[in-house]
């Protein structure tokens, strides 16, 4: 067991002070939580600095914080931002560690069994271990997570009970320490020294913690006593410093002991006998034979090796839980007085709600056809009510909060003023009759002013037809759709900003990374067709694309004003009025955001000259030779590794996609 530090303070480091609506929002949110509020909504318009407000609230409350985002990319962006704001505290990243994951499944119509197949990202596994160990060691922890945080993770009590605490002067036999390391799933390897392994050289034991990728621990013995503990560079062996105490956490989150394993095996055998009787009673002899064969094989593996493939399906037995009881998750590693923040809650909360049902439907099929025992259903994500039971204090953050948030709390704090003084755009509704000719006139006006245009349509065909029509008129236009690869997509956005073309057409321009300050006009065609792409929230998010430019305008082409349109227009007008009044009172003139235009493939800071950011020349794939492409792959691979080391996962992922596309070009 280890004692948790509870007296650390969050130290917010930022080159600017709160501005606009931020000071009032920070004060209100903090005071409400301190007064006992359990749930609040931060309704922050695009570009108002919601992350900075969240950081200030974390600093004021000084509690361990879990921030949940709806995808890995956004979680990576938030992680990087919070790392900058809190360089002296533990900011951790917890997302699914699978690069590739094919879940186990059975398709009865074609009698096809699909084996589970996965590829684990070692870097993310390290970060997950870092997150859980930080939560047990200290109180000044921020964990940025994806929805994977509601999936089973193992019992935190077992994890904590297996922590090895070592100090110089402590009496312990070297061989006893080696046995303890094996018990907590460390592997001995005297040659290939990496995460989760240890090696032995005489009276010296070197341990590579699962939460590190560069520093190892060297434990030096004198007889049966620990003489010295030093932290060393895992690659060079150079001593970094002496340690008076170290806590070595298990190499896996799924810890158990021999007694629990024996009990679990007996429990699995009992369930198997019960299930076989049911299947045979229903005349399902093939299913019964299949289940008996598969389960007995798994039991043999567990008895001999302490492990089997797909052991997570027996997690209920391993953790001694009752049927239907919720699994342990990352949320159980947080102390009771923690705070939760849900980023883009209008998307994230429906995701959390939907995880359980999707998982159950797939598993039920495996159980019905004799591939798994019914207890496999208890290896699952949390249900929404179970998730809510873990909530102490929660803050929903969104530009367009959903109905769930409204049900949970009536406390909504608005953040509408942008520190830049920029206003929400003007909105005009125009008739569908003659919409294209009207739009062409507006496009030409913007081209004369060297500004850009977004057009969003409802169908792929309409996008393609409109693109062809505008090209015939001599307008420089591109079409952005889901088939476009990552590299090409970032280059299209960059070319739009550079003015290589003036109009970008797409179906759903809400995706991250399409914030282009040069865009002064957003045209929404068929705005009165109710549906997902024309809902109130989608319209507000799309309207927000024009809020980065001082001349921002939105045209809604529609023959009638739907409820969604009315609400979106009213909300935008309300925000704009508040922003105008604030600017007048404080004598602020809105200025378009100046955002540097980087190459689609840009050099990460070089190791030799970290102060320099080197840009590659524009890449012309069509005219590059094979040798040049191979050289480019090598250079980009180096940049990708460097970006991952600097924890810039968004950049690393972009570079990875670029490398894959270059390789496919070469092949």
Curated annotation (Swiss-Prot):
CDD domains: DEXHc_UvrB, SF2_C_UvrB. Residues 435-597 form the Helicase C-terminal domain. Residues 630-665 form the UVR domain. Its main location: cytoplasm. GO terms for molecular function: ATP binding; ATP hydrolysis activity; DNA binding; excinuclease ABC activity. Belongs to the UvrB family. Forms a heterotetramer with UvrA during the search for lesions. Interacts with UvrC in an incision complex. PANTHER family: UVRABC SYSTEM PROTEIN B. This is UvrABC system protein B. It comes from Latilactobacillus sakei subsp. sakei (strain 23K) (Lactobacillus sakei subsp. sakei). The gene is uvrB.
């Amino acid at each position: 067991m280890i004692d948790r530090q509870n007296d650390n303070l969050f130290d917010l480091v930022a080159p600017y002070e709160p501005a606009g609506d931020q000071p009032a929002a920070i004060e209100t949110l903090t005071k409400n939580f301190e007064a006992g509020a359990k749930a609040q909504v931060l309704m922050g318009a695009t570009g108002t600095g919601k992350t900075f407000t969240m950081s200030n609230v974390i600093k004021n409350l000084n509690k361990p914080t879990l921030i949940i985002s709806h995808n890995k990319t956004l979680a990576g962006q938030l992680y990087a931002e919070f790392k900058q704001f809190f360089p002296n505290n533990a900011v951790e990243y917890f997302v699914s560690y699978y690069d590739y994951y094919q879940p186990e499944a059975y398709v009865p119509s074609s009698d096809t069994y699909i084996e589970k197949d996965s590829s684990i990202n070692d870097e993310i596994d390290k970060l997950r271990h870092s997150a859980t160990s930080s939560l047990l060691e200290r109180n000044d922890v921020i964990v940025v997570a994806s929805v994977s945080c509601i999936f089973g993770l193992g019992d935190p009590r077992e994890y904590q009970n297996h922590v090895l605490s070592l100090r110089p002067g402590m009496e312990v036999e070297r061989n006893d320490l080696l046995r303890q390391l094996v018990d907590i799933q460390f592997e001995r390897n005297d040659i290939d020294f990496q995460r989760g392994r240890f090696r032995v050289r005489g009276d010296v034991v070197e341990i590579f913690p699962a939460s590190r990728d560069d520093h190892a621990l060297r434990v030096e013995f004198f007889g049966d006593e620990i003489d010295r503990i030093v932290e060393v560079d895992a690659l060079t062996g150079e001593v970094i410093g002496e340690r008076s105490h170290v806590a070595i956490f298990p190499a896996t989150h799924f810890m158990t002991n021999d007694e629990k394993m024996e009990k679990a095996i007996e429990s699995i055998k009992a369930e198997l006998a019960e299930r076989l009787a049911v299947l045979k009673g229903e005349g399902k002899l093939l299913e019964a034979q299949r289940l008996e064969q598969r389960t007995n094989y798994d039991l043999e593996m567990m008895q001999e090796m302490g492990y089997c493939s797909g052991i997570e399906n027996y997690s209920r037995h391993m953790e001694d839980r009752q049927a239907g009881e919720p699994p342990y998750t990352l949320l159980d590693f947080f102390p009771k007085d923690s705070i939760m923040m849900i980023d883009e809650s209008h998307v994230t909360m429906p995701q959390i709600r939907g995880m359980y049902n999707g998982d159950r439907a797939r598993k039920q099929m495996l159980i019905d056809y004799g591939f798994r025992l019914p207890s496999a259903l208890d290896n699952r994500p949390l249900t929404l009510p179970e998730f809510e039971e873990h909530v102490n204090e929660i803050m929903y953050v969104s530009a367009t909060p959903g109905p769930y948030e409204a049900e949970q709390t009536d406390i909504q704090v608005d953040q509408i003023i942008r520190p830049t003084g920029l206003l929400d755009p003007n909105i005009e509704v125009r008739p569908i009759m003659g919409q294209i000719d009207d739009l062409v006139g507006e496009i030409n006006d913007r081209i004369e002013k060297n500004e850009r245009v977004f057009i969003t349509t409802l169908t792929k065909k309409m996008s393609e037809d409109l693109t062809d029509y505008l090209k015939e008129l001599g307008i420089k236009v591109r079409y952005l759709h889901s088939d476009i690869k990552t590299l090409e997509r970032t280059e299209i956005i960059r070319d739009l900003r550079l003015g290589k073309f003036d109009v970008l057409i797409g179906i759903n321009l809400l995706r991250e990374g399409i914030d282009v300050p040069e865009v002064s006009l957003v045209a929404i065609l068929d705005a009165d067709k109710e549906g997902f792409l024309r809902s109130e929230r989608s319209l507000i998010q799309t309207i927000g694309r024009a809020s980065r430019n001082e001349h921002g305008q939105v045209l809604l082409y529609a023959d009638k004003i739907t409820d969604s349109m009315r609400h979106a227009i009213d909300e935008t007008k309300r925000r704009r009025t508040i922003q105008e009044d604030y600017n007048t009172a404080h004598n602020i003139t809105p200025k378009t955001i100046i955002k540097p235009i980087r190459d689609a493939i840009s050099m990460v800071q070089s190791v030799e000259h970290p102060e320099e950011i080197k840009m590659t020349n524009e890449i012309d794939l069509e005219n590059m030779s094979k040798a040049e492409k191979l050289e480019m792959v090598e250079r980009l691979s180096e940049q990708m590794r460097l970006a991952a080391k600097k924890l810039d996962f968004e950049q690393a992922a972009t570079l990875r996609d670029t490398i894959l596309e270059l390789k496919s070009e070469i092949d």
